[in-house]
């Protein structure tokens, strides 16, 4: 990793990169043949340049200024003044541990799984681990739920880790092909993408991290009625613009204001307001958020994204994943779903 400040922005513009600083990725550029290069604009007039090195590179040798400076000059020109702020060599791996929970020891973030830096999956998945674990751990500590709820952390987040590992490995193989077939595919995609729009989405410089739906989670209650769209049990809630207390806001902000990760569940209700304001069972409760009463779906996007025809109810977990959904408000079914969602059944 090389951090270089100064007039690099002018050099970037001179090379036809435009005036707006943004990330750039080069595959097999003329100034670094056979490898890739990544450019980031950072604060305080600092630029970060990542040069891919060969698998047999000597890390101590490659950190020496006499090795680094010629690479930068080949990229930006021999006459551009710059300072080396920091130089380092790093390696990455795509792997995870067998289990994320061993008794009273729970692993999260980089201690549980490691991915390549492409796609911002490292820090994001660590935050998602914490979101998943926080409300479960609170309910167990409070004596509301048993340790079986912590087992669901392993089931859900190990599944998410595998999904991230798959996507990270695919990106790594595109950026740094390990076989002739992969190299031929990568080069063909790049050549096509310069002329054919259909090929551009195939360029994989790191698909950006998105939350993983827990499709097979033991905490999900299966649908008992048909629904359109993607908001199945286990899926992270899609955001939508709303009006709340006279102000423009968003669904996820309202959910955060209601409960955060304190252990509360939400019943998102479309159509007439349910007779009950909340439903409780086994030490947990779900509070009604009525669309049309508590919040206003002024643009209709919430109903569209959730297939929210009149009478529809969604049970939403504290980490903003869908636990269950129904076409009518039935307290008995909601109580059963709550028990299932805290692993007491």
Where are the regions a protein language model picked out?
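Core Rossmann-like FAD-binding/catalytic domain of the broad FAD-dependent monooxygenase superfamily
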Residues: 1-203, 207, 211, 289
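Helical substrate-recognition/capping region of FAD-dependent monooxygenase/halogenase enzymes
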Residues: 139-345
């Amino acid at each position: 990793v090389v951090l270089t400040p100064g007039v690099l922005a002018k050099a970037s513009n001179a090379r036809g990169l435009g005036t707006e600083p943004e990330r750039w990725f080069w595959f097999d550029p003329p100034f670094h043949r056979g490898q890739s290069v990544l450019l980031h604009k950072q604060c305080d007039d600092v630029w970060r340049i990542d040069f891919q090195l060969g698998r047999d590179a000597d890390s101590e040798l490659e950190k020496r200024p006499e090795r680094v400076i010629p690479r930068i000059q080949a990229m930006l020109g021999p006459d551009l003044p710059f300072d080396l702020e920091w130089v380092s060599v790093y390696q990455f791996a795509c792997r995870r541990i067998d289990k994320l929970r061993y008794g009273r020891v729970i692993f999260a973030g980089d201690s549980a799984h490691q991915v390549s830096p492409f796609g911002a999956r490292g820090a994001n998945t660590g935050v998602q681990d914490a979101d998943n674990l926080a409300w479960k751990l609170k309910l167990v500590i409070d004596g509301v739920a048993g340790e079986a709820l912590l087992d669901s952390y392993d089931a859900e987040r190990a599944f998410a880790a595998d999904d991230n590992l798959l996507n990270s490995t695919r990106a790594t193989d595109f950026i740094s092909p390990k076989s002739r077939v992969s190299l031929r595919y990568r080069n063909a995609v790049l050549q096509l993408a310069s002329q054919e729009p259909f090929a551009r989405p195939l360029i994989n410089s790191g698909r950006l991290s998105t939350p993983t739906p827990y499709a097979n989670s033991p905490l999900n209650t299966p649908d008992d009625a048909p629904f359109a769209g993607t908001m199945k049990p286990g899926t992270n809630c899609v955001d939508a613009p709303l009006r709340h207390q006279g102000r423009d806001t968003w669904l996820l902000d309202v959910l955060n204001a209601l409960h955060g990760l304190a252990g509360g569940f939400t019943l998102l209700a479309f159509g007439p307001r349910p007779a009950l304001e909340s439903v409780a069972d086994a030490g947990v409760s779900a509070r009604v958020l009525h669309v049309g009463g508590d919040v206003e779906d002024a643009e209709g996007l919430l109903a569209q994204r959730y297939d929210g025809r009149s009478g529809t109810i969604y049970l939403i977990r504290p980490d903003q994943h869908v636990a269950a959904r129904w076409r009518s408000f039935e307290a008995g079914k909601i109580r059963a779903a709550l028990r299932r969602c805290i692993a007491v059944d």
